[in-house]
A protein has these predicted regions:
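Feature marks short, highly hydrophobic, charge-poor N-terminal signal-anchor/signal peptide-like helices
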Residues: 1-14
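Short, flexible segments with low predicted structural confidence
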Residues: 6, 95-97, 127-128
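Regulatory modules associated with amino-acid/nitrogen control
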Residues: 21-123, 151-164
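A structural feature that tracks compact, well-ordered secondary-structure segments
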Residues: 108, 112-147
Length: 164
């Protein structure tokens, strides 16, 4: 009888140890898989532009100086939009929203790259940071409200991006 009790206790002990080892091993495996799935573009350098921007609607583009360093124009059948430095907002602006800062993905992006903006916006969305994205031929820009800039930088760095 005694031998049977010892056998049962040993069996239960081994089962518990096996369950603990399986749990720990599973967590390690899951973490390594998560790291392996991290997007390859993490590690890209993100530049913080040292100027304030305004997003606005204009009646037409006659007052827009296209020789300025930063000037993003969007024209549709419904509106004429403009993103420019706050100090350069034209007088024929009908609606404007000030207080934006910009992040630029450094370098020239290849058109075959997929998911860069999606990943950046997902990182910022988890922190409840709204964005306004603008793309050029070479790269992408993310505008965000300047009171959330520090939060955005922290979140992007924690996600593996280099922010300068």
């Amino acid at each position: 009888m005694r031998f049977a009790n010892v056998t049962i206790v040993l069996f239960l002990l081994l089962a518990v140890i096996g369950a603990i080892a399986g749990f720990i091993g599973g967590r390690i495996y899951k973490k390594s898989r998560m790291r392996a799935r991290m997007p390859k573009h993490r590690g890209l350098k993100i530049e913080v532009l040292a100027r304030d921007f305004t997003v606005c609607k204009v009646t037409d583009y006659s007052g827009v100086d296209l020789t300025e360093r930063f000037c993003f124009v969007g024209k549709t059948d419904e509106e004429n939009s403009l993103v420019c430095e706050t100090s350069r907002v034209p007088s024929n602006t009908t609606v404007r929203e000030d207080g934006w800062r910009a992040l630029r993905i450094a370098g020239t992006l290849d058109f075959s790259l997929v998911g860069i903006l999606a990943d950046l916006s997902a990182v910022l969305a988890r922190e409840k940071i709204g964005i306004f994205a603008v793309s050029t031929y070479n790269t992408d820009y993310i505008l965000l409200k300047k009171d959330r800039l520090e939060d955005a930088v922290r979140a992007l760095e924690a996600a593996g991006y280099t922010v300068v």
